[in-house]
Design a protein with these regions (language model features):
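Active-site loop segments of alpha/beta catalytic cores
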Residues: 2-229
Length: 229
């Protein structure tokens, strides 16, 4: 990973930012315990309900390892790092968002910034709804990434990171990108309009679906860049 970052850093165009990333401790633990992806991660839920102390120890260890991994990415050329908590909704649903998601990520951020000052950090706690408010208010972020279910105007009015830096990333529905066409164009312009006047990084509300035509991605990028001219 680090060697790849160094190579890309040397060869990429100057106008392109190099973003490093890692899974958040809760999402990593969910996959480790479950053994694979599952909608409800039932084995993970059963484990943390039965062995919460052990689960917290696991999250703490994963926070240490993730912080080191991100620090190494920055030292290898990453200009921005993003922490993905794709399954944060499970913690939120069980009233454990603060203990299972916020506190471990807070530890990561503090570790990273202690060793690499002024690090630019984006966090993505997917599908936590109104809990975005509490999540952002307790973390010193440079940017908060929004899933496609978040109302953008509501986000601008209500989601305020602890350090008051206001930047939003997102939140085109991956299904709309996969379909492409006029509906995609309409949604792109709507997103750009909704984020007018605030710092915004255009992105999807989650990952690119495997059935997405690469031409749709090219069209998306061209549309955004044409809008910026």
């Amino acid at each position: 990973v680090y060697e790849t970052l160094e190579i890309v850093k040397r060869k990429k165009p100057k106008e392109c930012a190099l973003i490093g990333f890692a899974g958040a401790p809760f999402t990593l633990a969910a996959y480790m315990i479950q053994g694979s992806g599952e909608k409800n991660f039932s084995k993970c839920v059963s484990f943390f309900k039965r062995e919460e102390r052990g689960f917290l120890l696991l999250l703490d260890k994963l926070a240490d390892l993730t912080a080191r991994h991100l620090i190494n990415q920055i030292k290898s050329g990453a200009e921005v790092i993003q922490i993905f908590d794709s399954h944060a909704k499970i913690a939120a649903t069980n009233n454990k968002l603060r203990d299972f998601c916020i506190k471990p990520v807070e530890k990561i951020i503090k570790r990273v910034r202690k060793e690499v000052r002024n690090s630019y950090i984006i966090c993505f706690p997917r599908n936590i709804g109104i809990n975005y408010i509490d999540y952002a208010a307790n973390l010193e972020l440079n940017c908060i990434s929004l899933d496609q279910n978040v109302d953008r105007r509501w986000a601008i009015e209500n989601i305020k990171p602890k350090n008051q830096i206001r930047c939003y990333q997102g939140n085109l529905d991956p299904k709309i990108l996969a379909k492409g066409g006029k509906k995609m164009q309409k949604e792109i312009h709507k997103i750009l309009k909704d984020f007018t006047g605030v710092n915004h990084i255009f992105n999807l509300g989650h990952g690119v679906l495997k059935e997405t035509d690469p031409e749709n991605i090219k069209e998306l990028i061209k549309t955004i860049r044409d809008q910026e001219k």
